[in-house]
């Protein structure tokens, strides 16, 4: 576990954080530019020192200002991946990967190289690599130092869209297979949803919220980030069963199920999905003989009048699902808070 309880004055920015990060999974550090995201992970790495407080990793004290104890960066067992790859141009990929290697067997080396899909690059030099390939090598080099935690500072920000998509696939795999915590700095909603288990929401140096991604996403505090064009709901649900003939998977939603296209997940394993309000309609009676597979019972808990539509939040088995309808439909059907309804979900995005 990573424990952070620090204060740091950085010019006009007063950074303050008090969080505990589990010993596995991806924790996103999310916020506007200048909110203190990179400064927070630099405090963990030792590149900057706090004014007050302490940071502990797996019962090791990295820094404690009260006792004036501070481990040098190179002794903290931390892997750091920057926005730019920072590879050594005069070393091959293999040479870059082996630089700083500690307590890593050949089998472990081969595993990391295979995990990141860079086996075919080992004899090449950085100058011949694409941006995405360079970042994969940089990640591999960080992992091969045998770190207790991996820090990633917007590793996709300098890449074009095709390279971002390419690297994202490897990051998704990496996040599921390595058994150390990852602190991942980003201001991308897509990266947040696809990669992170938890999110630290930062604003002007202060931690405004810290919880699982789906809880933060669905909370009012995150509303400004999603914009006003459309509501959305993020759910993390366990696999109930698979239906191979139709290539579909059912997720448990209380006593009901949510059908999605088939995913390679075991029964009981959680899958994160996003449902956009434009893909949801509401009926007063359960529809019969419809092509829509996802029809769920729920109760209206919130109604928001927008310029050109009405947004309704329906509580389904403890989960809030948003639907957007026309003002005409609202005037005709007169939906009200507390009313029992059925939601029809036309599409579900698997994150």
UniProtKB/Swiss-Prot annotation:
The lineage of its organism: Bacteria, Pseudomonadati, Pseudomonadota, Gammaproteobacteria, Pasteurellales. The keyword Transport applies. Belongs to the ABC transporter superfamily. Molybdate importer (TC 3.A.1.8) family. This is Molybdenum import ATP-binding protein ModC. Pfam families: ABC_tran, TOBE. The complex is composed of two ATP-binding proteins (ModC), two transmembrane proteins (ModB) and a solute-binding protein (ModA). Residues 289-351 form the Mop domain. GO terms for cellular component: plasma membrane. It is found in: Cell inner membrane. Residues 1-229 form the ABC transporter domain. ATP binds at residues 31-38. Its main location: membrane. The gene is modC. It is a peripheral membrane protein. GO terms for molecular function: ABC-type molybdate transporter activity; ATP binding; ATP hydrolysis activity. Part of the ABC transporter complex ModABC involved in molybdenum import. Responsible for energy coupling to the transport system. SUPFAM superfamilies: MOP-like (SSF50331), P-loop containing nucleoside triphosphate hydrolases (SSF52540). InterPro entries: AAA+_ATPase, ABC_transporter-like_ATP-bd, ABC_transporter-like_CS, Mo/tungstate-bd_C_term_dom, ModC_ABC_ATP-bd, Molybdenum_import_ModC, Mop_domain, P-loop_NTPase. It catalyses: molybdate(out) + ATP + H2O = molybdate(in) + ADP + phosphate + H(+). Keywords: ATP-binding, Cell inner membrane, Cell membrane, Membrane, Molybdenum, Nucleotide-binding, Translocase, Transport.
């Amino acid at each position: 576990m990573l424990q952070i309880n620090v204060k740091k004055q950085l010019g006009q920015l007063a950074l303050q954080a008090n969080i505990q990060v589990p010993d596995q999974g991806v924790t996103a550090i999310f916020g506007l530019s200048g909110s203190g995201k990179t400064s927070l992970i630099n405090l963990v790495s030792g590149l900057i020192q706090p004014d007050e407080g302490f940071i502990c990793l797996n019962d090791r004290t990295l820094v404690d200002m009260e006792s004036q104890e501070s481990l040098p960066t190179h002794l903290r067992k931390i892997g750091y991946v920057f926005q730019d790859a920072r590879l050594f141009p005069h070393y091959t990929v293999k040479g870059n990967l082996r630089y700083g290697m500690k307590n890593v067997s050949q089998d472990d080396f081969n595993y990391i190289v295979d995990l990141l899909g860079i086996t075919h690059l080992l004899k090449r030099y950085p100058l011949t690599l694409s941006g995405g390939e360079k970042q994969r090598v940089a990640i591999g080099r960080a992992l091969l130092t045998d770190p207790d935690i991996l820090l990633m500072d917007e590793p996709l920000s300098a890449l074009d869209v095709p390279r971002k998509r390419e690297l994202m696939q490897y990051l998704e795999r990496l996040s599921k297979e390595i058994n150390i915590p990852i602190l991942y700095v980003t201001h991308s909603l897509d990266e947040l949803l696809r990669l992170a288990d938890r999110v630290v929401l930062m604003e002007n140096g202060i931690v405004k919220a810290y919880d699982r991604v789906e809880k933060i996403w669905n909370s009012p505090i995150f509303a400004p980030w999603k914009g006003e064009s459309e509501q959305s709901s993020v759910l993390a649900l366990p696999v109930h069963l698979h239906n191979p003939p139709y290539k579909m998977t059912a997720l448990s939603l209380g006593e009901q199920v949510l059908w999605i296209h088939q995913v390679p997940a075991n029964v009981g394993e959680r899958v994160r999905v996003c449902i956009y309000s434009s893909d949801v309609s509401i009926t007063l009676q359960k529809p019969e003989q419809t092509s829509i597979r996802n029809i769920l019972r729920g109760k209206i808990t919130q109604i928001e009048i927008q310029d050109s539509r009405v947004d309704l939040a329906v509580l389904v088995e403890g989960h809030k699902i948003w639907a957007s309808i026309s003002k005409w439909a609202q005037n005709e059907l007169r939906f009200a808070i507390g009313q029992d309804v059925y939601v029809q979900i036309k599409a579900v995005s698997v994150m």
